Every structure is written in structure tokens, then in C-alpha cells.
Regions:
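Inter-lobe coupling linker of SF2 helicases/translocases
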Residues: 200-201, 207, 211-232, 244-416, ...
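Charged, non-catalytic accessory extensions
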Residues: 1-5, 34, 361-364, 368-483, ...
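Conserved RecA-like helicase motor core of SF1/SF2 enzymes
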Residues: 540-583
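A short beta-strand element within the Helicase C-terminal
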Residues: 231, 286-289, 547-559, 591-593
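SF2 helicase/translocase NTPase motor core
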Residues: 51, 55-84, 90-119, 126-127, ...
Length: 981
């Protein structure tokens, strides 16, 4: 067996992680982080939540070594309770065996393909990864798994997530809900409060180990240096493409973010994860800047050729993973994503609405035509006309608000940049603050008539665009969909809500805009998700930040975005991992409807020139390629051309319609050709780079075995479902099946368990599901869900702490053999640890021992870790029953679960159990050998995931595993051959 002596800390053996000690009148397990002066302890029969810290020198009674008590033969178990005891032990493990340390702390069941970034990370001394998976595949999950694994391996103690402001709260929730990590949000709004009262030698990032930091807050020169000097060991950067720097006028903010990341990456020992769905937008400088954050030599790929380039490309493949949904097929996981049905649905303005829109276009065209010599004034006036057009096309309410909002003539350069980004839908950093109506009012007297027309329309019925939306929603709701209507402006969202809230019978309608705080938005979404037939009206504050797949399955784009990425973001809120969808033709389906005005020349050109082109590139390449227009020069020129030539364009369109031609064509507009050429060039570059940098090293055959080992070590979905059914039924709170979900009444549970559940905000009657995606409105119950953990810990604590206890149905606790019918049900939370029954699964008397194995895992440069494992061994009588021999074939748990045969006489049952308990000391050599074999297997698992495909063995991966003896014998169960077998 591998020895850990050379890497073990200087601790007394009985203080080492995994050791048993006695203190304060009870037994404890020593947890990692212990020293001679400070012990981190978990009750022997308790949970991680009961852990405490004590100082041995301050204890009245000395802390002493302890041993695990053997089962008490006076409390005997039925087969049913023996199996429940085994399941409770399995579900209680948080520091489980297998190749990964963190899986016992995951609040979900990851898919096999999501293990790839984790395995890539474990092969690197310093983790530097660019994770560029498609929208909805699970980049947040993949990054969180890496962070949790490094934490649980003891390889880091702190980390920070850097992300745009609108994603801060989502990251805080995801880390807590999925990974049991309590992170602190750090934004411009709360940083001063967090810093208040801190000692001068500390700051936020030294006091709070886990932080989620707004990039807008931390990028400034005044804060950047302090963060870099005290930065945690791991940094996760979300939406990394917005931080990569760029050629041209990409904005001061992007360059500040890039400078920050460049300083952070200069520390060669810092772990960094970069997440983006669009790593390459056709801007070679930006893309290679991003690669340079992984390793400084990677930008040389631009200039190297031949073998030198191939070798560097091979090296990059260890740091870069990019997959689309079609790549998931080979992982046998493609069925987890729904089919997306899309449709472009035109509507036509008519009557007063058409007249008003034409008046606005005439006004805007005149502004463009009479542009003066002052370039800045000309630019701002044009942006004002675009803002007005967009608001008018959205709704009368947005038009009124825009016309009443005055554009400042004294804008700073940064304010101008912000206005430009909002007009062209260019920014991805401030979506929640981006849904207010754009200012359009100037000193031009021509606006007065437009204000009057807009106000008159606001009170009119028959809005053609609203009528078209109502028709689409009726169809969606009739087909069983739960839609989200995305619009561009707050005023439009409220306008639609007012018009639709009483339109559909039995439908619950709500509105969510950037006026609400992140917590208020989340609460409103959660409340609407509980409705039987929900309809949500939202601005783009929900196109990022809150996942909607568990309550909604359709998207309507009421307003076109000029940025195709924004459409993908909207649809990606529902079309993602975990979406249940609506079953159509046997397939889970989501639906997306894009509305556009067919007599609106701006909508027409956005649809034909921008959105359809983006879709075509995505379909051909497999990944999205953003429009290569960071400074919006192309879009600006395009819109000017459309306004100046709108009558000609309309005439061409009407002629095409008369000839039955469906697609628009603008071959004579040079600006359209320029945009098309630039975009095709960007797509070709992205296609080339996707081929060059594809991740092909880790294949399913190399990952699936690790996944299967983790499922065996910690339990999978079927194990969780079985345990919950058995435990809740035994405790009087049986599950009530409701289709794909279950109702769980918590009131019948013992008071101790109810109190623990209440502390986790679980009370009353729960609606739960054991599968992903869960039924709408149901909670997904996984192995680390509080319901499972509290049930498992409660049953174990009651059973392991009770040498002589009250008994439940089918069990007896006696000094003398009782009658066969003697039974009691006074404490169903107590499970017997010994039992005896007859079964056809064995031909000779056999003993199945349920064990908890404790190992100490020591890795170079890290604190020792405690690893626990639930296991079972079988011993079979030989030599006429004179001795027991270890069985090395088959699964002992299959024997334990095999159907029972006839009743065993009470006297024989008592004798068999007593004899087995008396032999426990004699079986210790067998148990010791088994534990050491399992320790060697654990070491092999640990080292195997460190083995690199073409990467040298690393110092960081060296490890040793030591079995902690004696083994904990949780249960002893005797199986006798059935009569006549």
C-alpha cells in the first residue's frame, strides 16, 4: 500500500483527518484543517452541519482516541430497514470516494459531457481554461464544478468570479444553490458597506473567501491595483469576450477590463477560467488577446507556421474547449436539449398607426438630410432619430416616453459611448439598466406634432402590432406553451401587461423590467413559475441573469433587436439544459416567434441583412459569430442608407411582393455589401479557428468510466428516489405521485427532522421531482438536496446513537428471545443494525457486513483530506461452518436485497446474530485487507484523472492514500439458505 508518511503533516496520529476521538462526552470524526491547537470535528453519527471547532488545551477532559462502537444485537432489523440503513449511509456521504472529491457537494447530477472541462483542469499544474461551449450547455456548471473540486481537494481556499453587473446575483445564487458555496456579491452599490468596519490590513477579498465581483466596479484604475495585489488563487471570468481588448473604437470599458485581466494573468501560479459562448467575433486581435491570457506564447499562433505552429496548437488544445449541441450527441446526452421551432411572423401597421409611423420616418429622414457641419451635433441628432424610430416601432407608450425625454446637449464622452451602445443594442454589460426609453426630444419644433399623435394613439384600441401578438399568444397557449414576451422598453412592457392581463382565461400574467431589483425579479419569476398557465412580459433584463427553463418554454420577440446575439440570449433563457418543453411529435419542443413590421423598412433591413445572416452563419458554422461592428460604423451607415432611400426600398419591396418573391434584396446599397463582406470574413476566420482549436483529446470512452465510478460511490438518481420513498414512508410521510412529480407532506415527520427542514425553508407540503428537467413547479431532489441529506443524517444519527432503543414495526430489542409477533412502532427513526433472514440468494450461511471506510488522502502541497466510502462485504461459512471466508465475486448488496424466504425461528435468529458479533474481532484482518485494497483503488482513481493525454505527469498530482483503521462496521446481517434450496 502507498505510504503517506513523507507528505503527512506533523500531527498526532489521533488528530489526523478521519481519525476518531472522544471529547465532551461523545465520539467525533476529525475533519481536514485540524492542528494540535485546533480541531475541526464532526459528530460520529452526525452530519457536516453539526461540525464544530475546539481547542484541546482548553478542554476540561483531554481529547482521546476513540473507536467506532459495534452494532448492538438487541436491536434487530428487518430486511427492509437493513436496506434503508444502507441507503441512508450512502446518502449521508459528502466526502465520498471515487476519482472526484466534490461530487458529494453538488446539488445536481452533472452530465457526462460536463466532466470534460473538469478533467482538463485536473491535468494542469496551473488551471488556465477557455470554456467556449454553446449557450445553454452549462458553462456556469462546468466552471463551478472545477472551483468546487479544487476547494474540496484543498488546492485553494479562495476564489472570485468576475462578471458583468447584471450577472452578479445569478452567480451568487448558482454557487449557493448548485455548489453549496456562500459567495458575497461585490458591486458599486454595496462595496462601501462591505468594507465598513474592516481592519486597515484587510479588504473585502481577504475577509470574504468567495466573491462575485462586478467587472464595472473592479475595472477602474482606483480599485484594480488593490484587487490584483490581494486576488484569490482562482479567478473565473464570465462573458470573457467583453474583456479581450480589440482593434478600433471598442470603448474605454473594454480596454480597462482587458488591462485588469492581463495583470491577473501575469501571476503564473494563478488559476483562471474564461467563459464565453462567442470567443471569436472575427477580430483576430481580440481573439488572440484572449488566448494570451491563458499563456503568453499563444498569440504567436498568428505568425508561426509549420511544425512550430502545430506544436503550439497542440499545447493550446489542453486549455481550450468549445462545443455546440451537435457535439453532445456522441456523449449520449443529446436528448436533454429540446427541439427549437422558430418562425418569423410579419405584421402590418395600418390606419392611424401607419400614418404616425410614416410621419416619424419623414421627420427622421429630414434630420439626416439636413445634417450640418458639426460632426458631434450631427451624430447625436442621428442617434436621436434612431432612438425615436425604435421606440415608435415598439409601442405608442414607448413613443410617448421617448418624445417626452430630452437628450442632453452636454454629454461627456463616456455618456455618448453609453448612448451609442444603447441605440445599437451593442452592450452586453448592463442589460437590466438598458431597458429605459431612449431620449429623443430636442429643440426641433417638428416634434410637437409627433407628441400629439403619439399621445392620441396611446388611448386607442386596435393597435395592429398588439393584435398580431394576441393571435400568436392564443396559439401558443392553446398548444400548451408557457410564453415569455420580450420587448425592448419598460413602457412597452407595462403597455402590453395592461392590455393582456385579462385577455386570456385562466392565464396568470406578470411583468418584469429593470425597474425591479435582482431579488425582486427573481421573486416575480418564481411566483409566476408556480402558476398553472403563466404568461410573462419582460424586457431584456431577463435575457441574461435568470434561467427560465423550469417555468417557460416559448419566446416571442415583440421588438427586434439590432444585435442578433440578444435574440440568442433571449431564446437561450428557455432553450437550455433542464428544459422540459412541450411534447410535439414525440419530442420535447420549445418555440420562438420573431415579430417584424413588413411595412417598416428598418425592421425589414434588420431582419434580412442582420438577423437572417446571423442565423445562416450559425447554421453553417455551428456556433454564433457576432456582427464584426464593435464601433457600430457599419450599422450606422446602413441605417442612414435605409432612411435616405426608404421610398425606393419600399417600392422595390412592393414590386417583389406582387411578383411573389418572399425575400428582400438590397444589392444596390453599398453599405449592405460592406456589412456582408465583413461578416463573411469574420465567419471564415471563426470557422478556421474552430477547426484548428477543436477539443478532441477527451472522448466519451475516457470520461464515462469516471462518471460511472462516481455514481457507484455516491449513488445516482434511482438510489435517491428509492431512499426518499423508503425513508418518508417509514416516517409516516409517504409520497403521493402526481404524474412526473410527487407531493410530500412534511407535518407527519418527527419534530427533530421538521425543525431541520424548516431551517432550510422546507415546510408544509412539497412538490418534488427526481428527474431532470423537473415537472413545472416542482423542486428537483438530488442526493445533496436538504430533504435527502436531513433524512439520511437523521436516520443515521438516531440509529448509531442508540445501543438500546425503542423499536419499530418488524424489529425487536430484547434480552431474551421474544415471541414471533412481538413488535412496536414507537420510534420509526431508529433502524436496527443487525438482522437475520432466509433467502434463496445463498446456499450456505453468510454474513453481509455494511461498512463505512475512512481514508486519508494526502496530495503534494495540500492539506490532508478525509474520504469516506459506503461498502459491503460478504463472508460465507466454510469447513462445516467453523470459519467464514471472504467472497470476492458478485455484489453483496444484491444478496441483501434478494427476496426473503420463510421465517427464521427467533432462537436461531438471536444465536446467529450473537455468533456473528462475537466473531467481529476475528474478522478484523479481513476488514483491514479490504480497506487497504479500497485505499489503493482510491489512489488509482485519483491519479488516473490526473494523467494527461500527451501532458507530462505533474508534481501537483502526486498523492498517497492511507486506510484509517479499524473499519466502521455499521451493520451485520446474517443470510441463511432457504429450506429445500
Amino acid at each position: 500500500m502507498n505510504t503517506a508518511a513523507s507528505m503527512a503533516p506533523d500531527l498526532p496520529n489521533h488528530f489526523a483527518p478521519g481519525s476518531l476521538v472522544r471529547a465532551r462526552g461523545r465520539e467525533w470524526i476529525v475533519l481536514p484543517g485540524a492542528s494540535e491547537d485546533e480541531l475541526h470535528l464532526r459528530p460520529l453519527s452526525g452530519s457536516e452541519e453539526d461540525a464544530t471547532v475546539l481547542c484541546p488545551v482548553l478542554e476540561f477532559d483531554p481529547v482521546a482516541p476513540a473507536t467506532f462502537p459495534p452494532p448492538d444485537g438487541r436491536l434487530r432489523a428487518s430486511q427492509e430497514t437493513a436496506l434503508l440503513l444502507r441507503d441512508a449511509l450512502l446518502m449521508s456521504l459528502r466526502r465520498g470516494a471515487g476519482p472526484f472529491r466534490s461530487f458529494g457537494n453538488l446539488a445536481f447530477e452533472p452530465r457526462t459531457y460536463q466532466l470534460v472541462p473538469l478533467l482538463m483542469a485536473l491535468k494542469l499544474d496551473v488551471v488556465r481554461l477557455l470554456i467556449a461551449d454553446d449557450v445553454g450547455i452549462g458553462k456556469t456548471i462546468e466552471a463551478g464544478m472545477i472551483a468546487r473540486e479544487l476547494l474540496d481537494r484543498g488546492e485553494l481556499k479562495r476564489f472570485a468570479v468576475l462578471c458583468p453587473p447584471h450577472l452578479v446575483e445569478q452567480w451568487v445564487r448558482e454557487l449557493d444553490d448548485r455548489f453549496h458555496i456562500k459567495a458575497v456579491a461585490v458591486t458599486a452599490g454595496n462595496a462601501a458597506r462591505l468594507e465598513r468596519g474592516l481592519p486597515a490590513t484587510d479588504n473585502i477579498f481577504t475577509v470574504f473567501p468567495f466573491t462575485v465581483v462586478s467587472l464595472d466596479y473592479i475595472k477602474s484604475d482606483s480599485r484594480r491595483g488593490d484587487f490584483v495585489s490581494r486576488c484569490p488563487e482562482l479567478v473565473i471570468v464570465d462573458e470573457a469576450h467583453t474583456c479581450a481588448g480589440s482593434v478600433g473604437n471598442s470603448g474605454v470599458g473594454r480596454h480597462q477590463r482587458y488591462d485588469l485581466l492581463r495583470l491577473l494573468s501575469a501571476d503564473a501560479n494563478r488559476h483562471m477560467l474564461f467563459l464565453t459562448a462567442t470567443p471569436h467575433s472575427g477580430d483576430e486581435t481580440s481573439f488572440h488577446n484572449l488566448l494570451g491570457l491563458l499563456k503568453p506564447e499563444f498569440p504567436q499562433l498568428q505568425t508561426l507556421t509549420g511544425n512550430a505552429r502545430d506544436r503550439l496548437r497542440e499545447k493550446l488544445a489542453n486549455h481550450f474547449v468549445q462545443r455546440q449541441r451537435v457535439d453532445i450527441d456522441e456523449w449520449h446526452d443529446s436528448g436533454i436539449f429540446p427541439r427549437r421551432e422558430t418562425a418569423n411572423q410579419p405584421y402590418a401597421l395600418s390606419g392611424q398607426w401607419e400614418s404616425f409611423f410614416e410621419s416619424v420616418l419623414d421627420y427622421c429622414s429630414a434630420v439626416v438630410e439636413r445634417a450640418g457641419a458639426d460632426e458631434r451635433r450631427q451624430r447625436l441628432n442621428f442617434w436621436g432619430t434612431l432612438a425615436l424610430m425604435r421606440c415608435v416601432a415598439s409601442s405608442p407608450a414607448a413613443a410617448v416616453q421617448a418624445l417626452r425625454t430630452r437628450m442632453s446637449a452636454q454629454m461627456t464622452g463616456e455618456e455618448e459611448e453609453e448612448l451609442r451602445e444603447r441605440v445599437f443594442d451593442g452592450t452586453e454589460d448592463s442589460l437590466p439598466q438598458d431597458d429605459g426609453e431612449l431620449p429623443a426630444q430636442t429643440d426641433d419644433p417638428g416634434l410637437a406634432n409627433l407628441v400629439t399623435q403619439a399621445e392620441r394613439l396611446l388611448g386607442q384600441k386596435g393597435d395592429p402590432k398588439l393584435v398580431a401578438l394576441t393571435k400568436h399568444l392564443e396559439e401558443l397557449i392553446r398548444d400548451g406553451f408557457a410564453p415569455v414576451v420580450f420587448c425592448r422598453y419598460i413602457a412597452t412592457a407595462h403597455y402590453l401587461h395592461d392590455q393582456l392581463k385579462s385577455k386570456f382565461s385562466g392565464v396568470t400574467t406578470s411583468v418584469v423590467t429593470g425597474e425591479l431589483t435582482p431579488d425582486e425579479r427573481k421573486q416575480r419569476v418564481d411566483e409566476l413559475t408556480e402558476a398553472d398557465r403563466p404568461l410573462m412580459i419582460a424586457t431584456d433584463c431577463l435575457s441574461e441573469g435568470i434561467n427560465l427553463q423550469h417555468g417557460f418554454n416559448a419566446v416571442v420577440h415583440y421588438d427586434l433587436s439590432w444585435n442578433p446575439t440578444r435574440h440568442e440570449q433571449r431564446e437561450g433563457r428557455v432553450d437550455r439544459f433542464g428544459q422540459e418543453g412541450v411534447i410535439r411529435d414525440g419530442k420535447r419542443t420549445v418555440r420562438a416567434i420573431l415579430m417584424w413590421g413588413n411595412n417598416n423598412p428598418v425592421d425589414a433591413v434588420v431582419l434580412e441583412v442582420i438577423l437572417k445572416k446571423a442565423k445562416k452563419i450559425r447554421e453553417e458554422l455551428g456556433v454564433p459569430v457576432p456582427l464584426p461592428d464593435d464601433d457600430h460604423t457599419l450599422t450606422n451607415a446602413l441605417m442612414q442608407a435605409v432612411l435616405l432611400r426608404r421610398h425606393e426600398i419600399r417600392a422595390r419591396r412592393e414590386e417583389a411582393s406582387r411578383q411573389g418573391v418572399l425575400a428582400l434584396d438590397f444589392p444596390e446599397v453599398p453599405q449592405i455589401k460592406a456589412m456582408d463582406i465583413a461578416w463573411v470574413d469574420a465567419a471564415e476566420k471563426a470557422k478556421k479557428n474552430r477547426t484548428v482549436f477543436a477539443q478532441n483529446k477527451l472522448r466519451p470512452a475516457g470520461v464515462l468510466p469516471e462518471w460511472e465510478k462516481m455514481q457507484a460511490a455516491l449513488g445516482q438518481t434511482d438510489d435517491v428516489r428509492r431512499f426518499a420513498h423508503r425513508a418518508l414512508s417509514r416516517l409516516g410521510a409517504g409520497l403521493e405521485e402526481r404524474g412526473r412529480s410527487y407531493r410530500v407532506p412534511l407535518l407527519p415527520l418527527p419534530e427533530m427532522l421538521r425543525e431541520r427542514l424548516f431551517a432550510e425553508n422546507l415546510h408544509g407540503t412539497l412538490k418534488i421531482s427526481f428527474t431532470q428537467p423537473p415537472a413545472i413547479g416542482a423542486r428537483f431532489v438530488h442526493r445533496s438536496h436538504p430533504l435527502v441529506g436531513i433524512l439520511a443524517d437523521g436516520l443515521l444519527e438516531s440509529s448509531l446513537n442508540t445501543p438500546v432503543v425503542k423499536v419499530g414495526a418488524g424489529e425487536t430489542a430484547v434480552d431474551e428471545p421474544p415471541s414471533a409477533t412481538e413488535a412496536s412502532s414507537s420510534d420509526p427513526a431508529v433502524l436496527g443494525r443487525t438482522g437475520c433472514w432466509a433467502t434463496q440468494a445463498v446456499q450456505r450461511p453468510s454474513a453481509v457486513l455494511l461498512l463505512r471506510l475512512r481514508h486519508q488522502l494526502i496530495t503534494q502541497g495540500a492539506d490532508p483530506l478525509l474520504v469516506e466510502e459506503a461498502a459491503a462485504i460478504a463472508l460465507v461459512a466454510t469447513d462445516g461452518g467453523q470459519r467464514m471466508e471472504l467472497v470476492t465475486t458478485g455484489d453483496p448488496l444484491d444478496w441483501l436485497a434478494a427476496p426473503t424466504a420463510e421465517e427464521v425461528a427467533d432462537k436461531l435468529r438471536v444465536e446467529q446474530v450473537a455468533n456473528a458479533l462475537a466473531e467481529l474481532d476475528n474478522w478484523q484482518p479481513l476488514l483491514k485487507n479490504f480497506a487497504e485494497e479500497r485505499a489503493n483503488a482510491l489512489l488509482a482513481d485519483h491519479e488516473r484523472v490526473r494523467e494527461a493525454s500527451g501532458v507530462r505527469a505533474t508534481v501537483r498530482g502526486r498523492a498517497a492514500v492511507r486506510a484509517l483503521l479499524p473499519v466502521d462496521v455499521i451493520g451485520v446481517f446474517i443470510l441463511l439458505p432457504a429450506l429445500g434450496f
